[in-house]
């Protein structure tokens, strides 16, 4: 029984990625949203990579049989060829998604290497087992 009650926490990255993919595809033409760091073939631009890089249990009860809440941290990496304004526009949409879902956004870093621009940031929040992320 506890296994079923805790499955929401272990599948949270997939849930968030699915919502983010839907949101980004409706705002940025041709974007590839993925959880896979590597893919075979020619790179696709723009690409948004979602990785859960950490997560702790929150709201633990004395019984501690179920996960009541988690505090996941996601790292978002956006890559694109082209103008700085283009990737910044994509980053604005991604940050807006996380802010609408009540995440804290931090560590926004922009780089360029071999004509490929990258924007990376992190997003974190506490979410309870009965909460639902808004479907934007």
Where do the protein language model's features map onto the residues?
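Beta-strand elements of well-folded, non-transmembrane domains
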Residues: 54-56, 78-82, 99, 125-129
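Acidic-leaning, charged glycine-interspersed low-complexity segments
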Residues: 89-136
């Amino acid at each position: 029984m506890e296994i079923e009650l805790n499955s929401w926490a272990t599948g949270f990255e997939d849930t968030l990625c699915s919502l983010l993919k839907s949101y980004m595809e409706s705002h940025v033409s041709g974007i590839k949203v993925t959880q896979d760091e590597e893919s075979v073939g020619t790179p696709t631009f723009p690409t948004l990579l979602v990785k859960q890089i950490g997560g702790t249990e929150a709201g633990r009860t004395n019984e501690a049989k179920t996960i009541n809440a988690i505090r996941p941290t996601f790292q978002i990496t956006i890559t694109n060829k082209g103008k700085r304004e283009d990737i910044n526009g994509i980053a604005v949409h991604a940050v807006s998604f996380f802010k609408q879902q009540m995440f804290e956004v931090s560590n926004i870093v922009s780089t360029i290497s071999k004509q490929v621009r990258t924007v990376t940031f992190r997003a974190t929040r506490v979410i309870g087992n009965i909460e639902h992320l808004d479907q934007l």
